[in-house]
């Protein structure tokens, strides 16, 4: 075992099973299962160990979980558990990092479709607001998802920390769908002595780092590339950057030279999000992944390191971080990427003047060859991008890189909410939940329709509820309902629903109706040499592409390319319901269609 990169599973402490009883007053009663071990320590070496104590079995009888405020007078109506965490460090100077989470074994759909079934993990014991570490609700979560409690908690000496886990149904809950439900949660965790920070984003001359201020509306501000507020992947805050007009309300040079100034949205041409280089732990080499959704174990990696695992439990560098610059199929020196920039939204604008913007219709009805050409335009001088950088249509492996990161502890780590904006497919829109769980009458309670989408979607990219079936914002805002890969405004949008997105993934150089006269250079597309998912990449599994490894996760469509339909598209469309999602994959002949859009990526010289 590589002692410098070992990860040690440390906890399997407390299983709490809740059984629904139902009733006019009591929504739930709960009871323990058989006796559980509640304090387990795993020690791999003599250097350190970690343990946690969940407080013993639940044996105190029933608690009636009813809609409630949480205070000293309502203790019979909510769950509160003390959790003691004890790292033991036996080597002077050793630093370790602990993660703690709740594994969801089962969760009723009524509990997954409300904002009011809530949790909080705190350092204080007086209330769920007393020293919050993490808090939220279970909206959009299903079995095999995790609820984050601690992430990379740093310890430099032996100690015992006490935290408090709160679970309750908020007093604002009025929906009867939360009755007659059940859930099963397991406290779990891991510990490591290695923490690798993500590679710093590599900026092209035209890319300007930004942050989002959502305290009063949505204000986009420039930020220094060395400012710690730019990104924090451990807190699911991904790095964003923009391309701007050379001369708009302000000049490009002004924005580049002045960190902290507000950017006029009319000056923005494109938004990008940085996906830092990483390796991930292989969890399967077969095709039977359906129903086996899990947190993807990701470790950030420097360009000096290439991981080449091929067996379950080993690590492999994600293939999107090799840019085969000379298209010779050989991994040459200088071709390892520190990361890639991915379009934050589906490509917008026109074929001759593309943009990447929110709240506008995506660019559709192009053949793959035309999409490929349009994506390259975003790398031109009009956008301020240097000729040494490479703007291109997103490859299938690059789609995989973004989705794998989203389903790790650094992303939303659940199914991404759907963009349910119909027909014109406005970018960045959200149904406020996962596909299949967005009926109109649940969001707009004065409506009776159970249709899962409308013309404009329900929420904007920055969380504003739209007035029903209009393109105008209401004053109501729900930042936790955005449809991004992080669950917040810093992530990538439109990867579930919206338009179907062609990607540069092709069966055996089969052009079909794509419009190409010959295939582009090999660095621009992923070539699948067979129609078997187990042998399509150099005779083996296509690691990292979001194919066999994530086959039919969350019930997403799972078709492979063929001689008749040789081009992949991803994500599903706005009206696919539960079949849409970031792991959705389908095939087509490369022709144009009003539902088919695409996404642009950018490889920066020096990355």
Roles of regions detected by a PLM:
Residues 397-400, 421-461, 471-472, 486-487, ...:
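C-terminal, surface-exposed recognition/capping segments
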Residues 2-72, 177-196:
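Short, polar/proline-rich extracytoplasmic segments that appear immediately after membrane translocation
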Residues 347-371, 513-538:
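A solvent-exposed, charged loop/short amphipathic helix patch at secondary-structure junctions
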Residues 262, 266-269, 301-495, 604:
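Short aromatic-cysteine micro-motif
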Residues 16-20, 29-32, 71-136:
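Surface-exposed interaction patch
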Residues 3-4, 64-73, 128-169:
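Extracellular adhesion/glycan-binding regions together with long Ser/Thr-
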Residues 30, 77-101, 106-107, 145-195:
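C-terminal, structured domain-capping segment
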Residues 196-313, 328:
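N-terminal module-boundary/linker segments of secreted carbohydrate-active enzymes
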